[in-house]
């Protein structure tokens, strides 16, 4: 089949890499415009663009597909000219109007990192961890104009381990998503079968995964230890949980566990112990053990290194 691929980050590049290895013809790759990145703020191509160029695939980077502008209409016409059988979309980042969704013969399929209709939206992986979900997965859906509202065609399931961060779960789901889209697109008859058997989402089961904002990564010590640990894992690698040091500087918390220690009478935020396992901090309920901390301008430190800095003390109350 002739496939158009649209995606931007590593999550999408994993799926594109898998599709490149199939007999299908990748006729075009769409990705977001190059962005400034790194300390030098150099224009950097997305992981999807880098992979596409390595395989000599045509890359297109329109700003939008809006019918209200000449640029948008030109982008629509350019896409239609590829005469694709199907378009695969994974974390692309641009809104696709209905005219684009209807352009390929079999429409547009989306690789979404959750078990829809739970966690529609921008941050499904992070929200699943923060909510304490026992499992998540990947849904392949036929795209509709609404936000992740399309009919579901195929699902894979992935348990969320107690040690999972958004970074580790992201990698697992990227691999599952790549495998899932290759299953759905194994051949044209297989695609027709999945389209015929697709399932409408139950709107009563919908939960939205709202976009992350930096402010919510500040640790609230009045929460229980289990929730604080979930948040720390959910916000790794971005925006990273933090403890304010002063008006401008934060202590970043990369990793944690729920401590076995108990301190029912300790003030929330108080350091009750420091050992080889980590920095044990009293919470609203329970104790959380911080195992990787990063001071401004430094690298992330393990528990032994943290103690050696002598920057934290037992009895100290964290902000």
Swiss-Prot record:
**PANTHER family in the record:** METHIONYL-TRNA FORMYLTRANSFERASE (PTHR11138), METHIONYL-TRNA FORMYLTRANSFERASE, MITOCHONDRIAL (PTHR11138:SF5)
Which superkingdom is the protein from? Answer: Bacteria
Q: Does the keyword tRNA processing apply?
A: no
Q: Which CDD domains match?
A: FMT_core_Met-tRNA-FMT_N, Met_tRNA_FMT_C
Keywords from the UniProt entry: Protein biosynthesis, Transferase
Q: What does this protein do?
A: Attaches a formyl group to the free amino group of methionyl-tRNA(fMet). The formyl group appears to play a dual role in the initiator identity of N-formylmethionyl-tRNA by promoting its recognition by IF2 and preventing the misappropriation of this tRNA by the elongation apparatus.
HAMAP family hit by this protein: Formyl_trans (MF_00182)
Its family remark reads:
Belongs to the Fmt family.
Q: Which gene encodes it?
A: fmt
* Reaction(s) catalysed by this chain's protein: L-methionyl-tRNA(fMet) + (6R)-10-formyltetrahydrofolate = N-formyl-L-methionyl-tRNA(fMet) + (6S)-5,6,7,8-tetrahydrofolate + H(+)
Ligand binding ((6S)-5,6,7,8-tetrahydrofolate): 114-117
All disulfide bonds of the chain are none
* A single GO molecular function term of this UniProt record: methionyl-tRNA formyltransferase activity
Q: What cellular component GO annotations does this protein have? A: cytosol
**Cross-referenced NCBIfam families:** fmt (TIGR00460)
A Pfam match is Formyl_trans_C
Q: What is this protein called?
A: Methionyl-tRNA formyltransferase
Which EC number(s) does UniProt give? 2.1.2.9
The cross-references to InterPro entries, in alphabetical order and at most eight, read: Fmt, Formyl_trans_C, Formyl_trans_C_sf, Formyl_transf_N, Formyl_transf_N_sf, Formyl_transferase-like_C_sf, Met-tRNA-FMT_C, Met-tRNA-FMT_N
């Amino acid at each position: 089949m002739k496939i158009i691929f649209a995606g931007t980050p590593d999550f999408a590049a994993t799926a594109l890499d898998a599709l490149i290895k199939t007999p299908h013809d990748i006729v075009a790759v769409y990705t977001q415009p190059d962005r400034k990145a790194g300390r030098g703020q150099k224009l950097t191509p997305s992981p999807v663009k880098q992979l596409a160029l390595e395989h000599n695939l045509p890359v297109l980077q329109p700003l939008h597909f809006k019918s209200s502008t000449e640029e948008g209409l030109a982008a629509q016409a350019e896409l239609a000219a590829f005469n694709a059988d199907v378009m695969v979309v994974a974390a692309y980042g641009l809104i696709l109007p209905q005219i684009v969704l209807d352009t390929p013969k079999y429409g547009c399929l989306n690789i979404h990192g959750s078990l829809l209709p739970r966690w529609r939206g921008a941050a499904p992986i992070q929200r699943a961890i923060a909510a304490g979900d026992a499992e998540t997965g990947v849904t392949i859906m036929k795209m509709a104009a609404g936000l992740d509202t399309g009919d579901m065609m195929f699902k894979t399931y992935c348990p969320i381990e107690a040690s999972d961060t958004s970074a580790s779960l992201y990698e697992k789901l990227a691999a599952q998503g790549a495998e899932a889209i290759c299953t759905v697109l194994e051949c044209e008859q297989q695609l027709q079968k999945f389209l015929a058997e697709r399932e409408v989402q139950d709107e009563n089961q919908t939960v939205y995964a709202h976009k992350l904002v930096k402010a919510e990564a500040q640790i609230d010590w009045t929460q229980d230890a289990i929730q604080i640990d979930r948040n720390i894992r959910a916000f790794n690698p971005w925006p990273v949980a933090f403890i304010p040091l002063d008006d401008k500087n934060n202590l970043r918390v990369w990793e944690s566990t729920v401590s076995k220690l108990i301190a029912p009478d300790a003030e929330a935020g108080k350091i009750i112990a420091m050992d080889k396992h980590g920095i044990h901090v009293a919470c609203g309920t329970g104790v959380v053990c911080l195992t990787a901390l990063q001071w401004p301008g430094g690298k992330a430190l393990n528990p032994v290194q943290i103690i050696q800095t002598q920057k934290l003390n037992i009895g100290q109350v964290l902000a």
